[in-house]
Amino acid sequence: MESKGSWTVADAVDYKGRPADKSKTGGWITAALILGIEVVERLSTMGIAVNLVTYLMETMHLPSSTSANIVTDFMGTSFLLCLLGGFLADSFLGRFKTIGIFSTIQALGTGALAVATKLPELRPPTCHHGEACIPATAFQMTILYVSLYLIALGTGGLKSSISGFGSDQFDDKDPKEKAHMAFFFNRFFFFISMGTLLAVTVLVYMQDEVGRSWAYGICTVSMAIAIVIFLCGTKRYRYKKSQGSPVVQIFQVIAAAFRKRKMELPQSIVYLYEDNPEGIRIEHTDQFHLLDKAAIVAEGDFEQTLDGVAIPNPWKLSSVTKVEEVKMMVRLLPIWATTIIFWTTYAQMITFSVEQASTMRRNIGSFKIPAGSLTVFFVAAILITLAVYDRAIMPFWKKWKGKPGFSSLQRIAIGLVLSTAGMAAAALVEQKRLSVAKSSSQKTLPISVFLLVPQFFLVGAGEAFIYTGQLDFFITQSPKGMKTMSTGLFLTTLSLGFFVSSFLVSIVKRVTSTSTDVGWLADNINHGRLDYFYWLLVILSGINFVVYIICALWFKPTKGKDSVEKENGKGFSVEDC
């Protein structure tokens, strides 16, 4: 007969704070409710982002480069706010409350955007042929910004906790549930892609043919329904107690090491402080040895409690395990930095590539494809790549190499190569499009929009590899207690990629334009040299790839009993190159 403990999850509780009963809490039913709210979040955020540049240019009458930067700043802020959401979830609210609060904020943002696009007072008058267009007023732009950044705030809070709360529904100490958890992560990205697919097809079509206010209204109602369904699972969820922000631990280790910076390290690590010497979870490493000084025991490091027990002051003394956990986070940074450029190239797919599409012939018979819906090829590439990888590449790789698939670092490398190829394809197509534009006076150029498919497909396939590779890398190579933070760190690569795009657009616009020359990024892309901008990204991506390979070769996974769940092939070697 099984003990009562075998039917409960050791580190989880139910909604009343009791040990979580496996038969009554968690599992696929609750995970499905969580996946549902993520699908709606993707539907809303991507449905707005992929078609926003056309609204800003055609309705709000803003210049091309300004419109592109508004979109990338919006997306960048969305992912940057994941850090705020992760901090609140870890330190105060917990994942359940964080998801509930921030999903409500996102619903308010989409509702406000629906109103902003509906009321004539909140947008400039329509342009008539031959007349100068009146740009949006400061008040109209303020309303738009408030709506967008409410959505960004909601997205940031949601994304920081949604995958973690989903994994909380499975017990990683139960082999059966651990297998379900792995399947959950595999399907998590699939559901994200499905939400994006609905956004770039159904929602974008509604925006162009029915009205943006109706489309955004549907997003608002969908999120409201998803929130209600999510809350219906309150009694069935498994909850993990907040353990405090790992940011505090990082600062404690740094502060203790700085305090003892002039002290000499002992010859042997046995003289360094450890909470439980018999249960060291992470092997000591020689990298970043200056941080080891935080574990040197010195006078004044211990304080007496009221019971007379001596305990270490965490700002003066850290254990070897805590120091090694901080080292693990530091080791992630070079890989983190060299994946940012991918998301800069990704940003072009929802800004300038959509603008390119708006000038090209988009008809299939009598049906005219919305410019924003061209990103369907981007999403299709992701889904096809994931299917081919799961069904063909992984079995072949396992048979040939004896490994379950490409390592996380190998997948990231493949993603970087594909995105570079995608930008090269984009530059070549833009050269062709510009040559047609010079010889044509038509508003819609006599060139098929399907010439853009290769760039969407290559960057989309690249995302399938790099997103799953990054997620795997940042989760498996981070300390157990810092996985929410490491997920947030991963998502900041998306954020910074969008911000780098905005920065490059602004710099290129300023450097290449003069009083007599519109430069590379003209208000009308038919008069500029967008292809030069794409070639610039190809060069930057190539340089970044070389740096990435160096960083990947330098990276050494930390060995430990509990901190890192390693599989064959998680490392990176010269052979992997």
Swiss-Prot record:
Which GO MF term does the entry hold, naming one? symporter activity
Q: Which InterPro entries match?
A: MFS_trans_sf (IPR036259), POT_fam (IPR000109), PTR2_symporter_CS (IPR018456)
Q: Which UniProt keywords apply?
A: Membrane, Nitrate assimilation, Symport, Transmembrane, Transmembrane helix, Transport
Organism, scientific name: Arabidopsis thaliana (Mouse-ear cress)
Answer whether the UniProt record assigns the keyword Transport to this protein. yes
CC per GO annotation: membrane
Where does the record say this protein resides?
Answer: Membrane
Q: Which family does it belong to?
A: Belongs to the major facilitator superfamily. Proton-dependent oligopeptide transporter (POT/PTR) (TC 2.A.17) family.
**Any keyword Ribosomal protein?**
no
Residue spans crossing the bilayer: 28-48, 74-94, 96-116, 134-154, 183-203, 214-234, 332-352, 369-389, 409-429, 447-467, 488-508, 535-555
Induction profile: Up-regulated in the shoots by nitrate, but no changes in the roots.
**GO BP, one example?**
response to wounding
Q: Which domain of life is it from?
A: Eukaryota
The record's principal subcellular location, in a coarse class, is membrane
Q: Gene name on record?
A: NPF6.2
The name of this protein is Protein NRT1/ PTR FAMILY 6.2
What PANTHER family does the annotation carry? OLIGOPEPTIDE TRANSPORTER-RELATED (PTHR11654)
The UniProt entry lists membrane topology as: Multi-pass membrane protein
**Which body tissues produce this protein?**
Expressed in shoots, leaves, flowers and siliques. Expressed in leaf petiole.
Q: Name one Pfam family in it.
A: PTR2
What is the documented disruption phenotype for this protein? Wider leaves resulting from increased cell expansion. Lower nitrate content of the petiole and midrib.
Q: Which SUPFAM superfamilies match?
A: MFS general substrate transporter (SSF103473)
Q: Describe the function of this protein.
A: Low-affinity proton-dependent nitrate transporter. Not involved in dipeptides transport.
